[in-house]
């Protein structure tokens, strides 16, 4: 049922309540009441982003009527990437994808512990609350949104901001890895270095 199975060739990631769950979706548009999810992927990292484990990647089946409502940008982008063809061929529903993804994530972190991590992640969360509400509740209510650092860096350190070039693949898994790389970039060039490596293992605030 998955387009891409969970990776088994990466270093082992130990289950830890400080692990971070990264997520990205592709949608038919920007309005969760009228548009639908067409792809979803997850990646779990440790708290310092040194180890990453890829989860399954799902193209979510949607009707031709739903796909026909996409604007020109979405039709062009998702047609060029092959996603529209994958969506048409898929038999996976939002509910089935959510169930399998939650089972995968539970191997690495308990419900309610990880913030939802990604770029402009509030938009993904809006769609998840609409179409995958039980899965949305798996996450902590906080978000780890890399776009916050992006906007601050653009205003406070524009030269550093220009140093990270996005590839804009617009596929869920590629976008997740790009978000992780972007956060690593800001950590190295924009944020004050941590006093010690052990700082990342401190207990999170309530």
From Swiss-Prot:
The cross-references to SMART domains, in alphabetical order and at most eight, read:
EXOIII
Record EC number: 3.1.15.-
Q: Which NCBIfam families match?
A: PRK05359.1
Where it sits in the cell: the answer is: Cytoplasm
Q: What is this protein called?
A: Oligoribonuclease
- Keywords carried by this UniProt record: Cytoplasm, Exonuclease, Hydrolase, Nuclease
Domain Exonuclease: residue ranges: 20-183
Principal location: cytoplasm
Give the Pfam families listed for this entry: RNase_T (PF00929)
> What organism is this sequence from?
Burkholderia lata (strain ATCC 17760 / DSM 23089 / LMG 22485 / NCIMB 9086 / R18194 / 383)
